[in-house]
């Protein structure tokens, strides 16, 4: 018995070393892929109790998507990685994204579907506020274009099914995003979405244009 344990010990150590190297390689692969995405900067590794890898990144967005002369700003995005072959949940937050930085945070659909998560802070909130802060460009349309840019950028990494979701104003954002870009995601799951008639009429007219 002792001889068997002595024989297995070096094998076990070698196996554990191989696992360590493999995990480190996967992490480096993801970070390199993030670094290679257009418009992505400020990549920071985050701790997570639920995801294999989690990063805070910033994506450069036009302040006004129809007027490049208005300048750019950086929008905060949290990327939680499960696998390149897994579905991706696009969280269309309606406010700030600070709570998603918590290591214990796990989005519900991401948990149910064993899916990646791309969590987008709404423009003009917290660290996604342009400088100078011109409120003229805080529109639902610009927000939808922000999400479209995020979607198209991260589709280079995650080529599977995409699901957009949000709660309250985030649910509203999910609906409006789908109105402007109906083909960006495969499913939209708003958790409560307060909308008024004026908003719906404006969105319908703008999307038709």
Regions found by a protein language model. Name each.
Residues 112-127:
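Conserved alpha/beta-hydrolase
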Residues 11-20:
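Bacterial N-terminal signal peptides
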Residues 171-182:
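Short glycine-enriched nucleophile-adjacent loop
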Residues 137-155:
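Alpha/beta-hydrolase active-site loop
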Residues 190-198:
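Active-site nucleophile loop of the alpha/beta-hydrolase fold
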Residues 158-167:
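Alpha/beta-hydrolase fold nucleophile elbow
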Residues 202-209:
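Conserved small/polar residues in nucleotide/adenosyl-binding loops
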Residues 26-115:
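Catalytic-loop region of hydrolases
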């Amino acid at each position: 018995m002792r001889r068997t344990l002595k024989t297995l010990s070096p094998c076990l150590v070698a196996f554990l070393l191989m696992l360590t190297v493999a995990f480190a390689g996967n992490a480096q692969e993801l970070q390199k892929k993030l670094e290679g995405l257009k418009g992505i900067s400020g990549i920071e590794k985050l701790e997570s109790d639920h995801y294999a890898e989690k990063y805070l990144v910033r994506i450069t967005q036009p302040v006004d998507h129809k007027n490049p002369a208005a300048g750019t700003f950086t929008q905060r995005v949290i990327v939680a990685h499960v696998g390149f072959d897994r579905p991706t949940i696009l969280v269309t937050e309606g406010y700030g994204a600070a709570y998603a930085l918590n290591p214990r945070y796990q989005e519900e659909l991401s948990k149910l579907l064993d899916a990646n998560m791309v969590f987008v802070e709404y423009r003009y909130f917290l660290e996604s506020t342009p400088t100078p802060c011109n409120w003229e460009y805080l529109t639902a349309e610009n927000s939808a274009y922000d999400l479209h840019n995020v979607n198209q950028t991260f589709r280079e990494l995650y080529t599977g099914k995409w699901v957009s979701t949000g709660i309250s104003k985030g649910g509203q954002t999910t609906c409006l995003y789908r109105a402007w870009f109906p083909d960006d995601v495969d499913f939209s799951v708003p958790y409560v979405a307060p909308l008024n008639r004026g908003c719906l009429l404006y969105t319908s007219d703008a999307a038709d244009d």
